[in-house]
């Protein structure tokens, strides 16, 4: 009777492998559909931290991140001009 209560280690291993495969397949499908946009790196909302402006600043974008419909946080384009480097003494 006690043997029926113990889960087979093979069953647990199979379930873990199946879960990992499902997550990998669904993630690659989302990326292949062009959903990811580097200008819109996150989500936004009242309870989301950091806010869009803070997230964009942390990722190296200029200040002024905004929340577009669908709760997607988007950033302003980075300047492609020369970077001001302060002189060292």
Swiss-Prot record:
GO terms for biological process: defense response to fungus; killing of cells of another organism. Disulfide bonds join 40-75, 44-67, 52-73, 56-74. Residues 1-30 form the signal peptide. It is found in: Secreted. Coiled coil: none annotated. GO terms for cellular component: extracellular region. Keywords: Antimicrobial, Disulfide bond, Fungicide, Plant defense, Secreted, Signal. Belongs to the DEFL family. This is Defensin-like protein 78. It comes from Arabidopsis thaliana (Mouse-ear cress).
């Amino acid at each position: 009777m006690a043997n029926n209560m113990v889960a087979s280690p093979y069953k647990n291993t199979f379930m873990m492998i199946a879960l990992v495969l499902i997550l990998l397949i669904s993630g690659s499908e989302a990326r292949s559909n062009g959903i990811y946009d580097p200008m819109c790196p996150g989500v936004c909302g009242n309870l989301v931290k950091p806010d869009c402006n803070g997230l964009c600043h942390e990722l190296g974008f200029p200040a002024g991140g905004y929340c577009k419909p669908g709760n997607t946080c988007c950033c302003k384009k980075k300047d492609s001009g020369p970077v001001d480097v302060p002189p060292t003494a």
